[in-house]
Amino acid sequence: MFTKKSHADVKKSTAKLQDSKKDSASRLRHLRMILDNVELEESKCLFETNYSHVYFILYDTFIQAEANLKQKVHKAHREELDGSLWLLEKILCLLPELLARRWQCHSLSRIMAKLLHLGNSPKLRREGVRYFLLWYQTLGENAPGYVHAMYADLIPGLIVPQKGVVGPDTEFSASDFLTHPNMKADGGMASVFHDNAFSHPVQSSEVVALLPPSSSEKSAPPDPRDGLEVLLNSMVHTAACLRWRDNRAQKDHRAFAFLLQRFMDVFLPVFSPNFDVSCSIYNPRLDLPVMRSINKKEEVMASCVVVLINWVSRFTHERLLSHRLDCTLHIEDVDQVRLHGYQQGLIVRDVLYVNRENINFVHEVYRQAFLLNFTSKPQIEAIRTAIAVYRDWMTGETPPPFLLEPNDDPPPPSNAGGTPRSQRLRTPSYVGAIAGSKDQLVVRAGRQNVLQVFVTNAANVFLVNTANLNICFPTRSRSYRSTPLEEQTEICKKVLNVYRTMVMNTEMDTRTWEQLLMVLLQVTSIVLHQNQHTLPSGTNKSATLGGILGSAIFQTLIVTWIRAHTKVPVNVLLWEKFLNVLQSLTHREELIIEWNKTIQTLTRVFSRYTYGINLLDLPLDRVAESRAEKRRRIGSVWQGSGSNSAANGGSAASAAISQNRQRESLAESSSSRSEETSSQVPLPNHPRPHHQHTQSQGGTGHGTRPIPLTPMLSRSYSEGSLASAARSSRIRRRRAATPKPKALQPSQLAENRINPQDLRRAMSLDSLARKGDAEETDSYQEGDNESGAGSRSPSPTASSGIEGGSIKDAQLQIDASLDDANSGSYGSGSNSGSISGRRCIILGGSAEGWHPDSTSIMWKRMLGALGDVNRIPKADLHAQVFMHLLEMTQNLIKIKQNQGISTDNQNTQPMPPLVPPIGIVAPWCYGSLSLDRSFKKGKLWALQLLCSLAIQGAVNMQQLPLFYHALHQLLTGEDRDLIYAILKHLEGPRLLSLLLPGHTLLLLDLVHASAILLTSLEVSRSTPRAEVAALLGSLLCYPSSLLTRSVLQPTPQKFELMECSDLQDHILNIVLRCARREPSAKARCIALSQLGQWLLMRLSQPLPASNSGRANLFQQAVPHHKDVHPKASSVYNPRIKEVLQVLLQALQFKHHTIAIVAVDSLKLCAERGRQLAAIERVPQLIITAICKALEIQSVTKPKDSDKVVLTSLMLCLGEFCMAIPAPIMLTPFNEQGDTLVLQVLRVLLQVASGAPRHERVKLTADDDFDMHIAHDDLQGDGRLPEATYQTSETIQKCITAIKLCAKAVSMHLVTHIGHFPMGIGASRLSSMVEEQDDIGNAAYGGQVETRRDSVELPSVVSAQNMQLFMLNSGLVASFIELPTLKLPGGGITAGLVTADKQVRVLMRDLNGKACWDASILYSEPRNAEEPPKTTPKIQHSQPLDSMATSMVTHTPSPRHTLRHRPAGVLPLAKDMAPDLDQLDDMLAYIGHTSPECVAPTVSQLNAPTASPLSGNQEAQAISVILNQRLLEQEFVTHSTQAPSPALRHASSNSSLQQPDQRSLHSTTASFDSLPTRTEMPFQYCRLLFSHLGLAGWERRSRTHLLQRSEKLMRELRNVDLQKCRETHKMAVIYVAAGQEDKGSILRNTSGSSTYEMFVSALGWEIDLETHNGFLGGLPRQGCGATAPYYATPFLEVVYHVATRMPSDSSEAMLLKTRHLGNDEVHIVWSEHNRDYRRDILPTEFCDVLIVVYPLRNGLFRVTVNRKPEVPWFGPLANESVVSGACLATLIRATAINASRTKRAALPLYQQFYEERNRSLDSVSSRYKESTTFEDFASRIYNPMPLSTLGTLRESNASSSAAPLASALLDHNRASVKGWVQASIDSGPIMGIAPSASAGSTAAMEAATGMSSASPRGPRKLGAPFKSVTKKHSLQHIAVGGGAGAGGDTPPESPTLPQRRFK
């Protein structure tokens, strides 16, 4: 039995304990020793056996200690008291059964009274409370009344009123004493022991304090809070301390339940009079909380309430209990004290949860927490605690029993303690006492009831005004003290966070949702209204709770509202309350901000679920094909498969979906976090004005589920919810008829309509137009249809938001992951049979989440949540609302624009049946325009919105009267800001292209408003000066037939029509003024461009009544030959000259962009040169003004922009000089005889020479022309490129380029003026003849044809009949002597007697290459038999091609005379004869008639002077000459008689003898009387060279030979490849109706008739195979047969027309795509109903996109879209309306200017003449041969000496690899004598062994026969040259011929044909 000590010791001590003789102290000591050595059960047996002894020991020791302490407080005496109290505790714990029967009740009460005396020390009194509670719970209900009274006095300072109601036998009455047997004596009234004189014979001594407090302990007055805390803690500490014999667990619970009940009955009503004992969570009273005030009396006891709250939370807060258990279990060697303490906590909690009353008590305690008033820090912490408890109840893993549903199965017993581990710490009986109770099912209230109670009670934290409390609370930071308002704000944030947790993560039923909504409405209404009215107007927002939390409250309310409607059907009356609350708070900016966020978010959801478009990932934003391909590979968000994918659960698909979700969530909000374990959504600490409701695709528990993101609404699940087109149009008409949009408020509609179908229709989005009629079903109930809808998804975020007390930036997110399985893909489930089961909740179905119907209805409901927005009282908020409405409308427009966009760009998708309701807010806009001036900002936003609707075509016929009326009133009103807003947002000419019915009525209003704007001095970026200029310009060029004369009278009060026939004249005046004085650069440019268009139209259609039929829709501008004069009308608009003057004045602008635009506008008229010439003095005016502008624009230190302006001016000048008829250009215009050509050349010479101007040129602009630009809006966009700094090098480059341009233009004019185009057309200005065409087989009449691109050049290099000269640095000339060409019919020289050879001169310069043929003319045919006359006859030989002209030479007549006139006869021309010497006779006549002229030493003037030679020498010289003459005559005679004539040519030391196989050629009309002569191979070239004056000494410094080599010939070929004109290539693309993808557009092979007419008017068709001009990279075969081509004297344009190119194969499509994609300018003709986009044909180029849209009225809308780096250009600006007469011309000019401007913006770009000049300079610098005059003259006589030729042949014949050029370089310095000297030196040899000329073509090819052909067979000429049969009456010539195959023929060069040499 005894375990700790031996039996002897325990028994001995027991005996001593029972010995009454021993003193009580010894007995107590032995008792303590016994208890220390036995178990508890043994101790209980011991006490029960010896209870009398034990109590005696207690009483005796207590009395002794009391007596000792009264005498003196000593340590020993305190120890005696402690021992006595120890025994008291043991008695109370071990003898509960005895005590329960009131054993020693009176004695114990005396002891307890002494212990509980208020004079005792606090420690002793705390112990006394504990002992009393042990005793009190033992007695229970059996306690007498005075014990209950003692309990009521446990809390000092808390006065408990005695109710006087006591139980039976609770106190002794006087009758009990009197009837007691001991009281009876003699007489029945005498007592044996006591004096019975008194009614109470025993007087109780006065109870005094046992142990007064020490001096160190405070003696402050008692605080009820401390007493209450002691009492509550003691209640816990006394639990489970009594050792009952049986049923201990139940009795422990019952004992504590008794204490708790007594506490609730006695103390609770005292310190918490507002404690509602009737509060019940089982039948909750959900009265909405109201505003309360702070009562100071209540605040006194608030600290006690805080103590109670904290005490209850210790045992109901799951997190704290779990934490205590964990701490207990993790400590090694768990002591019994800790374990007992934990068990006590469990008992307390179990008692609190044991029945409904206690559970209601707990919730009422927490309700009292929410009713605290933030007046102390403990109160604030108590509120935090209450919030945390409820939060943990809702989110904890083990809910308390009252949260369980009554119908659910009971929880397992292990869960009773809160955690499974608590099972180990309990005995089976203990657990069974708790879990086995039948009351467990009774206490279950269900989660919904608790949520409703919490929602209602927690709202009280908002409903107290703490702003006026002057209190500060200490914080952790010493420097900062918080205020009650700040603390209340943090608490409210926590409550809102819990509300949001419920909204997002908690399942709630209809009643809970409605309660939450009502509470939020109540909070919103009271808090925001109360703070608004109780504070002065100037108070800062942060000084009120509503000001701080307004945004968060509104957001929570709105989000809860939307979320509720997708979860449960909500009563429609709540919608009324919601509307009323929001409409009453429209004066708060926070509401407007949150409403905007909600609308924008709902618009995104609306877009996704109704139209299948993600606004954050629009199809149009995915421009690059590679990105789209990458999306398709990864797996697009839009490929979700719905419920089928969810059923399959593929891991790869779910992973892809989750990746896409994360990407999209990050795209919407960078602050969105996603954690699976999150439990709530914190609110933002400081609401950001720009934060958005993020759109998350994931929620807790739905992370891996494939979600249907694009339900394609092929069929409506609500059947009739989406109104049909007819019904929606009726509703739109009804709404448009009233300015105030009542239709936006479904509640108002519900009041006026009875039919439930109409009501449901109004609730749904009536603006959704659906093709066809939707089915109508009658299965809906009216109540269901009245409920709203909406949804928000869980937003998992970190739980630290609530713990930290801050509202973080984690918004309630829009639901994209639906919570149930029946919300699958609509596209796949549309054919399912049970459609009604898939209906959304708002329509009476059961499907939760977003559906097309629910999103549409909720979007529209929230749109109208503010009521009539025009009733918003504050103007700035009114403006803010309309700004947000505009943003929403722009998103709707984006949806519309992105519908039907092909993702693969290979086919065009059909337009979907649903169209976004873009114009849904139009009635509000019309209503806002009628407000007063204070709402001006809102009216501006409304106007912008209306204009956007008009541009998008959303203004229907019913709204047009309202729209026109509003525009008319505002345009003619006085408010300029509104006028400017209309003019800006109508986008100028865009209004005209809309073709709104009756829009011409507003023309006069628009012109009137435009005039007001343009005449004002307001210049800013917001002033639409450019748009107005474009609008007026388009109206200026409008066909008069389309302008109605009836327009609205421009007065604001009237709406009447008037006649205005001179509208365009009025517009012209305004545009002229704009061009003269406009301060904005962009508007000035547009005005000048429009004037140029007007000029073009008036010159193209001189008569106003010109035919406007389709036959004259386009005019093709084909350049005519100079002899062809087209018919021109002689009647022109009289204001043409005035307009021209303005354009010409603008040329002098120092603003370079404006000057270039003026030049471009003027160039438009260059094509109409003949029409301009018909107007008096206009050509002279134009030429003079351009020349003057050149002088003005010329500066000494030009920049790149100056260079661009000057070159544009010079090229424009050249164009006009070529366009104006040559007779006008050559006619003198002043007395000095100056012509326009002379004036032009003078200016160009001045520019080219860089001569400085000695006097300043005065501006020719008149006084009305303003050269100043006040607002340069082209600074950042459209400005010409300029270097940031200038250096001498850059300046010199610009000067060189300007001079070169002037030189090129002047040379061009000299060559081509009056000659363009020639017979061949405009395609070529340069000759196609090359040197190799005349070398080789030219001697055979050109019978063999070779390739032009052949690289066999040695025959040219070594040709004896050709020489290359550099006449100056920019002019290379080739002289070639060749036999006279046989032309059909004799050509131009038919019948004339010419030499048998002719000279061909090829000249290359900046202007191109020219070919001149020169031939000697002997006589006319009629004088063939007579001796030839001495007068030369000029004749032209037929050129090789039509671009070559003939050069004329003449032969000198022989000068040998045999007779003389008499000295006195005057020689006259009429009696001149061949045998008379005119000069000799004249000298004789002068000497005879005027002897004074004869010198004294001279006999006569015609007498020769004395010979300087002696007589012998003179005779010898005469003899030599005569011998030479004789030899020549013999040689001639011998050569004419020889059957095989041969020529002999000898070098200085050797001779080459080769037979001459060339038959001598002579003309058909040769001289028979004269012997046939054989000239030297270069004789005629030498004669021409000499006759041209090139052989003179004075030209020696500029004329040089060129070193002939293969490299030189390739360089010359490279020069020939350089263009002589500016070249452009452009793409022309046709888009048919319904085409919006790359594939279908490129497959078009033809277009409409109007398109074909347009293409034909862009230029003229050329045959690609035979075209000799610019091809723009097009191959001659493979890209179609023809292409449009356009050319002027200075430029060439080729159009890559997509419909001309084949598309029958993938290779052809690839080739077409390459050609089109590489063009920098795209011209698109679109007949599709939507605008063309750049990304349809994706390319890195396409810097400028010009799109033409044909309009219904015969006009054309043109848009010009340029990349940002492209500067501004004209004449067409973006958005223009153009007539067909000038469309092609304007498009062509705009495209050319665009291409030119783009190139000018490129760094290091060079013009065509710069590139050609560089090539010519390369030839001059590399191959110029420096020779002495002797060598130079020798090479003219003999181009290739034999020494050089022999070396060439040896090098060619040898096996060495030395190139030909090295041989030329090595031997060109050989000592070679002239031709004549060589002949004299080798005279004898010449006579003996004549040989053929080594330099002749025959000698070169002696080894081959006449019929030998080139080793390469003849083939068709390749690009870029072709030999074709000319279509005109020229001869067919086959030129060229390869060298023979013999050993003397130079080898082929291995160089490729197209390679360039440097």
Swiss-Prot record:
Biased composition (Polar residues): 788-800, 1546-1568
Chain positions with Phosphothreonine modification: 1945
Start-end of Pro residues biased regions: 400-414
Pfam families xref list: RALGAPB_N, Rap_GAP
One Gene Ontology MF term: GTPase activator activity
Region (Disordered) location: 1-21, 400-424, 635-804, 1534-1568, 1903-1958
Domain Rap-GAP positions: 1612-1819
Gene3D superfamilies: Rap/Ran-GAP
Regions of compositional bias (Low complexity) in chain numbering: 640-656
GO-annotated cellular components: cytoplasm; nucleus
Protein name, as recorded: Probable Rho GTPase-activating protein CG5521
